[in-house]
C-alpha cells in the first residue's frame, strides 16, 4: 500500500469515528433543542428587525414554540475547505489565497477559523482556532497537486467546524468534479443533514454540473455560487461572510413529533419576506 493509500485509509478510519461521535452528539442535542439559521430578505435586502413573534416554525407539520430568536453577532466558526488539485495553480491559486485571506480579514473578535485542503489527499492545514494568523499562514503555504477529493474534503470540513460554541459556516471551493474521494456523496450528505453547519459552495462553472455542491448547500440552508472565472473570487467569499452574518438563529425544543428520522422544517415570517433555511434535519 503506497503512502497516499495509507493516508486515505487513516482518514477514513478517523472520519468514521468522527461521524459516529458527531451523530451521537447531534442526536442528543436534537432531543433538547434544534437550532436553525434563517436568512430573511425583501426587495431591499436582509430584514434585520424581526423578533420571536414574527416567526413561525413547523417541525413535520407541527407548529412549535420558539424559545429564542437571536440576531446578535454570535461568534462564528468558519471552515475553509479548498480545492488544491493540480488544476488550481498559478493565477487561480493566487486568487484563491487572496479570497481566503479576505474572508479571514473579515472575522471579528471571538470568531474562529480552520483550513482544510483537498487534492488526492485531504489535509487539515490549520485546526479550528481563534488564532487567525496561523490559519492565514497555512493558507499562504498551501499548494496544488494531484486529483480532486471534493466529497472527502467537505466531510472533513464539517467535522472540523463542529462545536458547542459558535455558529458553523463551511465554505467549500472547487474548480472541478470529484475524482478521488473514498466516501460517497450520499454518506456525506447524510452527515450534513445531522450537522448544524451551514455550507456555502463556490464552483467554477464548467460543462459538468456541481450537483454535490448544490445538494450540500441546499440541505444545510446555504447557497451555491457558480463563477465563470476566479478574478472576483475575493468578493464572492466576502459576500458569503456578510450574508451569513445577516442570519437569525432560531432555537426551539421539539414537541409532539417523533424524535428519530427525517424532520421537515417549514419556517415562515408573518409580516412577509423571503425565507431561506435548511429544509429539515436528520435525528
Indicate residue ranges for each PLM-predicted region:
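Positively charged n-region of N-terminal signal peptides that target proteins for export
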Residues: 1-6
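Bacterial N-terminal signal peptides
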Residues: 7-16
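Small side chains
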Residues: 15-18, 113
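Scaffold/interface architecture of coatomer-like assemblies
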Residues: 22-283
Amino acid at each position: 500500500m503506497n503512502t497516499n493509500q495509507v493516508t486515505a485509509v487513516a482518514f477514513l478510519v478517523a472520519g468514521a469515528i468522527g461521524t459516529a461521535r458527531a451523530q451521537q452528539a447531534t442526536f442528543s442535542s436534537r432531543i433538547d433543542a434544534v437550532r436553525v439559521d434563517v436568512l430573511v430578505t425583501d426587495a431591499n435586502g436582509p430584514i434585520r428587525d424581526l423578533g420571536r413573534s414574527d416567526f413561525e416554525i413547523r417541525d413535520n407539520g407541527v407548529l412549535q414554540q420558539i424559545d429564542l430568536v437571536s440576531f446578535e453577532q454570535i461568534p462564528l466558526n468558519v471552515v475553509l475547505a479548498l480545492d488544491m488539485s493540480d488544476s488550481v495553480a498559478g493565477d487561480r491559486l493566487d486568487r484563491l489565497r487572496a479570497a481566503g485571506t479576505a474572508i479571514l480579514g473579515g472575522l471579528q473578535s471571538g470568531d474562529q477559523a480552520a483550513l482544510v485542503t483537498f487534492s488526492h489527499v485531504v489535509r487539515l492545514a490549520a485546526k479550528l482556532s481563534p488564532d487567525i494568523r496561523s490559519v492565514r499562514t497555512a493558507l499562504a503555504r498551501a499548494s496544488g497537486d494531484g486529483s480532486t477529493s471534493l466529497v472527502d474534503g467537505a466531510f472533513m470540513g464539517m467535522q472540523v467546524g463542529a462545536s458547542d460554541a459558535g455558529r458553523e459556516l463551511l465554505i467549500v471551493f472547487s474548480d472541478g468534479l470529484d475524482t478521488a474521494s473514498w466516501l460517497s456523496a450520499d454518506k456525506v450528505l447524510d452527515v450534513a443533514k445531522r450537522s448544524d453547519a451551514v455550507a456555502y459552495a463556490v464552483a467554477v462553472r464548467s460543462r459538468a454540473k456541481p450537483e454535490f455542491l448544490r445538494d450540500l448547500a441546499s440541505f444545510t440552508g446555504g447557497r451555491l455560487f457558480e463563477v465563470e472565472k476566479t478574478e472576483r473570487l475575493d468578493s464572492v467569499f466576502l459576500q458569503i461572510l456578510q450574508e451569513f452574518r445577516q442570519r437569525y438563529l432560531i432555537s426551539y425544543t421539539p414537541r409532539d413529533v417523533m424524535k428519530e428520522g427525517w424532520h421537515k422544517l417549514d419556517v415562515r415570517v408573518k409580516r412577509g419576506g423571503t425565507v431561506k433555511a435548511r429544509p429539515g434535519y436528520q435525528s
